[in-house]
Amino acid sequence: MPVNDRVLIAGAGPVGCSAALYLAQRGIPVTLIEAGAVLPEDLRASTFHPPTLDMLDELGVIDQLLEEGIVCPEWQYRDTREGVVANWDLGVLKNDTSHPYRIQCEQYKLTRIIVAELEKMDNVDVRFRIRATGTSQDKHGVTLNVDTPEGPEELKGRYLIAADGASSVIRITQGIEFPGLTFPELWLCTSTEFKFEDHFEDLAPIAYIADPDFWFV
């Protein structure tokens, strides 16, 4: 295919990587760029739901993800005063999905799995330390302006997928709004090996625990 039939993807997070693999498996050439020198590891989310797992199965990466994560067939909302408020058994979805459970796994592990697959493919170009700065479009396709270690560069493609995060340069330069709000409270996200099951009766593998004073989950 000519270069202008290539799909450009900005951002090598879970969305960008998954889109790249989906397109490449269907014979569509892809250029995936990432502003960082390596794949980001500060991705906050860690839950993969049944529809996402079905999609990842179609992409051929579900087995690797299962090896990296924890299978959770149920999850809870809890209150420190009342105990279990609600319990969800994902097994009820067994006739609607091939994966009636959630997988708890850091998102960066998925991006590593997918990029390893992309690097085996001839129609994919994965480039790091490439930062999007702007974009334009004409009847022939799209131009993505980027900064590289060697200086400014233009990438040409038929389409552009913006997966460059909450502060997306591409979205901003296109004037696309991202309405929302910011909570005034400060939040701390941490990983721990603390044995919560020793302190909460009937604790599910995933539990969101609310407290009226400390607000923890």
Question: Where do the PLM segments sit?
Answer:
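Conserved FAD-binding catalytic core of PHBH/FMO-like flavoproteins
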Residues: A116, P152, Y159, A163-V217
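Beta1/beta-strand and adjacent pyrophosphate-binding region of the FAD-binding site
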Residues: P2-V15
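Glycine-rich FAD pyrophosphate-binding loop
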Residues: A24-R44
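Core beta-strand elements of the Rossmann-like FAD/NAD(P) dinucleotide-binding domain
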Residues: V3-D5, E150-Y159
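Active-site-adjacent segment of FAD-dependent monooxygenases/related oxidoreductases
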Residues: R44, H49-E117, S136
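A conserved short coil-to-beta-strand element within the FAD-binding core of flavoproteins
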Residues: F128-V142
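Residue-level detector of alpha-helix initiation sites
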Residues: G13-P14, L39, L43, G165
